[in-house]
Amino acid sequence: GIDIEQAPAVYARAAELANLRIVGVDCHIGSQLTSLPPFLDALERLLALIDQLATQGIRIQHLDLGGGLGVQYRDEQPPLAGDYIAAVRERLKGRALALVFEPGRSIVANAGVLLTRVEYLKHTAHKDFAIVDAAMNDLIRPALYQAWMDVTPVQPRDGQARQYDLVGPICETGDFLAKGRELVLAEGDLLAVRSAGAYGFVMSSNYNTRGRAAEVLVDGEQAFEVRRRETLAELYAGESLLPQ
């Protein structure tokens, strides 16, 4: 990105180049934004820049506000998309600008679920662990960002809840999906890690030679496998033995 204080000079230089055509201003102030003020502050700064460029004879046609509306992972209360658009439109009255938004996370995050099964329960003097068959290579956000993901048993059971750390089978201290969750669990239980639709598969890896998970699209009462699980043979397919 370009510092907004340097932007006028950069646009002026671009305007001098015959093979460049200036059409817009774009910004990206972050992701998982859960309040309107940061968006509106960025918008005001961009509008001031657009007005300054106009005095230099540079006409801006489109405005990309970038960033992304946040979603509710836990107790966040992000603004509604309609409120966001209304606030932006109010500030753009009388301006002939094509608007571009990047709402990816808000569209897909809460539409995705990572399903994982409890393989073992491990009780120690200090902590209880639920070892599941998913791992940080499948969903790295908790390990990478300390992200909080809601975990729900697919079939709830009665019993005394215990506080579990949900960990995967990878030999890494950071291999966890959730920590300190009050759950009633038994080996074999299926768990849903919710809000996994954004930055899930796209950030997954083959660490520890683990094939990436299959993806299933659910439409009403129908389910379709839209990406099959990777096989071990596929992971080795790109490798070659050294010559004899």
Segments (PLM) and residue ranges:
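Charged (often Lys/Glu-rich) extended helix/loop segments that serve as interaction or gating elements
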Residues: 87, 96-244
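Residue-level recognition of conserved structural "scaffold" positions that shape functional pockets
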Residues: 8, 31, 37, 73-77, ...
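Short glycine/threonine-rich loop-to-helix capping motif typified by GTGT followed
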Residues: 35-41, 72-84, 109-120, 179-181
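Active-site beta-loop-alpha junctions enriched in small/polar residues
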Residues: 27-34, 63-70, 104-106, 135-137, ...
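Electropositive phosphate-/nucleotide-binding environments in soluble metabolic enzymes
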Residues: 1-4, 8, 40, 78, ...
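Active-site-proximal beta-alpha core segment in soluble small-molecule metabolic enzymes
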Residues: 1-62, 71-76, 87
